[in-house]
Amino acid sequence: MTHLSLADPVREPLFSGEAGRQTAMAKDILAEAGLHFDELNKLRVLDPEVSQQTIELKEECKDFVDKIGQFQKIVGGLIELVDQLAKEAENEKMKAIGARNLLKSIAKQREAQQQQLQALIAEKKMQLERYRVEYEALCKVEAEQNEFIDQFIFQK
């Protein structure tokens, strides 16, 4: 394995082309070993592209978590709203059931009252028939008595 030193005071100065080639070779050797230089020329274990992608992924994850938090708040609000509407619907349902039962009760009361009135009408009709029969009987008695009186007066 070849070891290169970027700063070697013993060597004589190299031409810029050759120095660039040696620097590139050194970077390639370090890259093969899993070491890389970043934009500030600091030695890193991760490839700068991978590092940048990691940072971007971390930011995207943070944004995603923030959006999930907002989504959960919105969903929580919707759930509360739906629960409130369900309670109101249940209350209205109970009111409707109560009103229906009240109407049934009123209908039954009216039916009972109607039956009572019909029974009273039937009773009054029977009483009227008795009075009519009694009246006819009294009219007959009156006619007989008037006839008797007339006969009595004419006989004298």
Curated annotation (Swiss-Prot):
Subunit annotation: Component of the IFT complex B, at least composed of IFT20, IFT22, IFT25, IFT27, IFT46, IFT52, TRAF3IP1/IFT54, IFT57, IFT74, IFT80, IFT81, and IFT88. Interacts directly with IFT57 and KIF3B/Kinesin II subunit. Interacts with IFT88. Interacts with CEP83. Interacts with SPEF2 (via C-terminus). Interacts with CBL and CBLB. Interacts with TRIP11. Interacts with TTC21A. Interacts with SPATA1. Interacts with USH1G. Interacts with CCDC146. Interacts with CEP78; regulating IFT20 stability and localization.
UniProt keyword annotation of Membrane present: no
Region forming the signal peptide: none
Any one GO molecular-function label of the UniProt entry: small GTPase binding
One GO CC annotation: cilium
Native species: Bos taurus
InterPro entries according to UniProt: FT20
Protein name per UniProt: Intraflagellar transport protein 20 homolog
Record keywords, A-Z: Cell projection, Cilium, Cilium biogenesis/degradation, Coiled coil, Cytoplasm, Cytoplasmic vesicle, Cytoskeleton, Differentiation, Golgi apparatus, Spermatogenesis
Subcellular location: Golgi apparatus, cis-Golgi network; Cytoplasm, Cytoskeleton, Microtubule organizing center, Centrosome, Centriole; Cytoplasm, Cytoskeleton, Cilium basal body; Cell projection, Cilium
Role summary: Part of intraflagellar transport (IFT) particles involved in ciliary process assembly. May play a role in the trafficking of ciliary membrane proteins from the Golgi complex to the cilium. Regulates the platelet-derived growth factor receptor-alpha (PDGFRA) signaling pathway. Required for protein stability of E3 ubiquitin ligases CBL and CBLB that mediate ubiquitination and internalization of PDGFRA for proper feedback inhibition of PDGFRA signaling. Essential for male fertility. Plays an important role in spermatogenesis, particularly spermiogenesis, when germ cells form flagella.
Gene that encodes it: IFT20
Domain of life: Eukaryota
Region (IFT57-binding): 94-156
Tissue: Expressed in retina and are more abundant in the inner segment of photoreceptors.
Coiled coil: 98-138
Gene Ontology biological process terms in this record: cardiac muscle cell differentiation; centrosome localization; cilium assembly; cochlea development; establishment of epithelial cell apical/basal polarity; establishment of planar polarity; inner ear receptor cell stereocilium organization; intraciliary transport
